[in-house]
Amino acid sequence: MYLQSSFRKSILTLLAGVSLASVVVFAVVPHSIHAQNRMAFSAVSSSSGHVALGLALRKLSVSGTFLQAPAHPDDETNALFTLFGYGMGLRVIDVQNNRGDGGQNEIGPELFRDIAVLRTSELESAHRIDGAEQYFTRAIDYGYSFDPEEVIGKWGRKDIVGDYVRLWRTLRPDVIVTMNIQGRGGDRAHEATTVLVRESFRAAGNPAMYPEQIGEGLRPWQPKKLYFAGGAPGGGGGGRGGGQTGAEAAKLTPVNTGAYDELLGRTYADIGNDAHSNHKCQGVGGLGGGFGGGRGGGGGPAGAAAGRGAPAGADGPPGAARGGGFPGGGRGYTLVDTTISGQLQKEEASLLDGVDTSLTGIAQYAGPNPPRALTIGLAAILTDARTAQKAFAEGSDSGTAAPVEAGLAAVRALRAQLGGLALSEPARYEVDFRLRLKERDYQDAVLAAHDVTFDALADDGLVVAGQPVQLLLTATNHGASDVAVTGVEIAGFEEPGNCALGPAGKGAAYTCNAQAHVPKDAKPTTPYFSDNYWKHPENQAIQIFEPGVPFGVPFAPTPFRVTFHLKAGSAEVTRELPIENRYVKDLYFGDKRMELNVVPAFSVRLAPTLAVIPAASVGGAAKAVEREVHVTVTNGMKSAAKANVTLEAPAGWKVTPASVQIALTHEDESLSARFQVTAPLQPKLGDYTLRAVVTSPETGDRKFTDGYLEIEYPHVQRRQVIEPAEIALKVVDVKTVPNVNVGYIVGVGDQVPPAIEQLGAKLTYIDQDELAWGDLSKHDVIVTGVRAYERRPDLRAYNRRLLDYVERGGTVIVQYNKMEFNREDYGPYPAKVSGNRVSDETVPVKVLVPGDPVFNFPNKIGPNAWTGWVQERGLYFLGDKDPKYIDLVSMVDSFKDNPGEKLGSMVEARYGKGKWIYLGLGLWRQLPAGTDGAYRLLANLIALPKAPAQAAPARKTNGELHR
């Protein structure tokens, strides 16, 4: 079902705001559910209106937590969050094993740490729509693996099981859904994740497991049910493999995410697909299979009408769709462990079968004979919830205010009574844990019933230590009765201004203009996991989390926050939200918001970040190698400033000039200083560091040696990563050929061109016009960037021109592409890209045509050229191909589940007078990492037109000689 564009937009906007009530970050603090530590992910400051009220009311009559535990960002099924969160009113949580650090980037240059930041931001954007909270373990996605035990070994079984146990004890989920342990396709980190989640399921409830957590104040918690994502018969969407058949398929618990929600005007699958489409750096568009089904959606529209207006079940909110077995409307899940007696033998209709998620069910935590005062109190709260829901169903939004106010008072009264009830201390904790959550839900419902929204804006988003900031704090009353602001607390600043208190009449707004100062000792903002990202324990792919940050949160909560205290009817409520800056980056991005980011007074960035110094060149006398280095300084201060820029070089290296003076006239202005850095005449092989230092009379004797990398796209909130202003100088045993002209067709997130320039080649970027009708013969070699055939429609359109260039004697090197390469025959002869890859970066590489120039000129490519590679050998090799293609190398992966000789990673074809080469070897990943052998191989590839003449390569395959 498709909605009109404007209505569709309005629903998404409402959902973005509504999710604020659900997207909460809980610190790991003993004896607290951390309900005040909120994190606003919304593009609007709060939710409002009829839809927001309806969703808030659904939460009041239920109590329970649904949690998914997938491996990587995009493995979650977002429609499950929308079904259980929006549809059923439960708390919904996404606990990712890792941040997807080892993946590819289909929209930009970020890799490793930086793509971890981007993918974390994309998850935040997804949860703005689906309403889930987000957490992570410390595991690092170190790359693709075919062996789950290898993955577990690198993560550290005890460590990551302990992380899951910590999160289960903190979040206390009732139902956990993870991936499918039976899957035999794809990255086996999925299977490893499932193994560890299963081990943690029982460990969390055992106080003898991870006793240090108990010592910190955490309490044992035993979740009630654990499910594996199951597939449709014969495969389907079972979390990347893992289809079940026969009797197993019959026992799958069905979930109908295709149900239609009248309040939202959409199906849960539709909303889930919109959320899932935020995984743009993975090329996700909202469709396709995945974790438990259609990744984002997980279900079609079949049986949708069954959910319209029907009660959700015992004590569930009316008007919501109940997840159940609607044929064709969802996916199935396999119950693998449960504490509910006999449940494994039952045929289930819902993931919640046997789990009491009613509000009155909170009494179960008081034991078999709960105090009568507790059951009476819970019943009274439920009565208020039902009264409010009934008023809403009858069309009286304003009629919901009095009962939700009464319900909030009843929750608070019951919490106050707990100390006097005949409850054990553990029982009191469990009951209060859930009542605190319910108090939060009732406060949200009070604000929704009175239709009050909040905003907290600063006049600057990039601030420096000590800077004054002007704040505009607003509480807007869209409702039918007056409210009053009784308190405003501004946090994170020095000398925050005071706000006069007062009413906000119906249709009016309370505003406060205040000035505050960023603390003089404020540190620059950076992801809490980024400072130590490269310092993880030796031989272990695990992060070091910064102390003091709530465990596993996406990013540390901003310290710059405001808390409003409000009197609405008879209720006193609070709302905390981050202070943001509203800005327009450009017309393409449109109006955006960001939390306040502290930046250095002078941000210092160097280019290039890696300077490769070849040890020798072919022909001519030896001479010292020079590199031009650009130091860009950005003024973070409000005032004009002068800066002195110097470079600290290794002993024996020369820097000219010794220093550069620059004058910055205004905030955010950037100026660059140029330096010539000259290596010694015969530098020793190895790694060196060049550091930039900026000083200024405006900042006394402070030295500025850091800059920040900005990570921002239209679909994510701006994030920055603080980096030292350094260049890695790498003297490499590589020979280069002078006067090589390379034409480059840029692909996705390309970092190969700087490496080509480091090798002394003249690089020219080929744009659409040149590709269409320019003189390509001026290039000795043309290189297409990573996934260029996906990114460049002009390349697909004018590919014939490249083949003509080859036919006349040119050399074309095509870096890896995915299946988009298979739409047409883009090579000189028929060939298809396959999913073949070699994930073990240490396996031997067998050279099949040792006499080919690519292995001999100007560098001899021997075994040492293949050492020191990172993450993998390569991926997306050529598969089925015409015999005219000659494989130059082969490999055998070390993983038993990736058997056989792998060809297609480096393939050459003679066409006319020239050469066409396909390169699945991962130079795009090795070159930025400074892998020596990758530079030698690249030097030979771009030097092919200059190599001595040689006959067509030949090798034997199956006893036949191929030329």
Descriptions of predicted regions:
Residues 458-738:
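Long beta-sheet-rich domains in secretory-pathway and surface-associated proteins
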Residues 787-870:
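A glycine-rich, often tryptophan-bearing local segment used as a flexible ligand/cofactor-contacting loop or short
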Residues 203-446:
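The feature marks non-catalytic terminal segments
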Residues 13-29:
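Bacterial N-terminal signal peptides
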Residues 703-785, 816-820, 925, 943-963:
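Aromatic-Pro/Gly-enriched surface loop or interdomain linker
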Residues 441-453, 593-603:
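Proline/serine/threonine-rich low-complexity linkers at boundaries of modular beta-sandwich domains
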Residues 832-930, 949-962:
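Catalytic beta-strand/loop cores that center a nucleophilic Ser/Cys/Thr
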Residues 36-170, 191-202, 206:
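Active-site rim/loop-helix segments in enzyme catalytic domains that contact anionic ligands
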